[in-house]
């Protein structure tokens, strides 16, 4: 086994977790977590599920854990992180996860939550990619009082590729944040981000995404887009897309849009005899479901679409 190379090709400013106060707390207090390593050339043919269960007797507390995932050369893994919360009390989960994806390896990382919770969830993910490796992220979340995913992806060697797709359906006073920083540290790398939110009641969605391109990272191809459907006046969506580019031969774009349901589409569905409530759900489902189109595993895609439909229908 080769030693960890999590700081390879990364500037100290980009990789310094100690600037994050919750990471400092985690480094001091983390008591649990897991280490997962996939052997060279080994490809799991079924998804691996990490089941995070919070029991009803969990009282006010803070849980700190630290995880490590390593995919060795030419390995593949689909990992599903599933949150199931039964506690009605305030608590906090503070997680750190270090991911290393080595040459020609592929990791599909899927986050699912639709549990009602008064808890606070924060997760910091730092990933390092080698040549020809691929890191795909799919995020489906609804129901949490506060949830923040802080994702840093380092494309350290050429032809590495990363994607982040997110579908958030927020109700009541739910607050969800996604923060990404994609560091293009080598040439010929690709990154693609599409973040979608549907916001109702007094919910709030936040997206802050940064694409950083080093001078050496020529032929970079980077795309970033966030969209939000705001269903009433009290809901809120804040977006801060950023580009910081030092190379001159790149293709980079970013943008953010927000608005309400398209009334022409709604009228069309109603004119076909579909009740207004169901028409709303169909439009929301189509809007959020687009984030799963690039998922190649049909059985996993169908599972996620079913979960998404459950969130939209309040199940």
Predicted segments with their positions:
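Single conserved hydrophobic/aromatic residue that forms the stacking wall/gate
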Residues: 2-14, 18
């Amino acid at each position: 086994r080769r030693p960890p190379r999590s700081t390879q090709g990364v500037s100290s400013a980009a990789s310094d977790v100690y600037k994050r106060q919750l990471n400092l707390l985690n480094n001091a207090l983390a008591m649990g977590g897991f280490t997962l390593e996939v052997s060279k050339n080994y490809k799991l043919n079924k998804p691996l599920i990490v089941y995070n269960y919070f029991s009803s007797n969990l009282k006010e507390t803070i849980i700190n854990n630290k995880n490590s995932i390593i995919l060795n050369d030419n390995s593949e893994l689909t990992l599903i992180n599933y949150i199931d919360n039964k506690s009605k009390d305030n608590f906090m989960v503070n997680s750190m996860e270090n991911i290393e994806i080595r040459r020609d390896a592929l990791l599909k990382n899927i986050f699912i939550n639709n549990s009602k919770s008064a808890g606070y969830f924060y997760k910091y993910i730092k990933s390092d990619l080698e040549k020809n490796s691929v890191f795909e992220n799919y995020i489906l979340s609804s129901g949490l009082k506060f949830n923040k995913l802080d994702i840093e992806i380092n494309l350290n060697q050429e032809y590495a590729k990363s994607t982040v797709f997110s579908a958030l359906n927020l109700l009541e006073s739910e607050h969800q944040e996604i923060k990404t920083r994609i560091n293009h540290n080598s040439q010929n790398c690709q990154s693609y981000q599409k973040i979608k939110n549907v916001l109702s009641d007094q919910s709030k969605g936040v997206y802050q995404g940064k694409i950083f391109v080093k001078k050496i990272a020529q032929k970079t191809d980077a795309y970033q887009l966030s969209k939000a459907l705001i269903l009433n006046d009290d809901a809120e969506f804040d977006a801060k897309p950023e580009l910081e580019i030092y190379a001159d031969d790149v293709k980079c774009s970013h943008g953010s849009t927000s608005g309400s349901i398209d009334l022409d589409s709604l009228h069309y569905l109603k004119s076909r005899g579909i009740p207004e409530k169901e028409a709303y759900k169909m439009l929301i489902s189509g809007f959020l479901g687009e984030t799963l189109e690039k998922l190649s595993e049909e059985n996993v895609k169908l599972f996620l679409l079913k979960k998404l439909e459950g969130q939209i229908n309040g199940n």
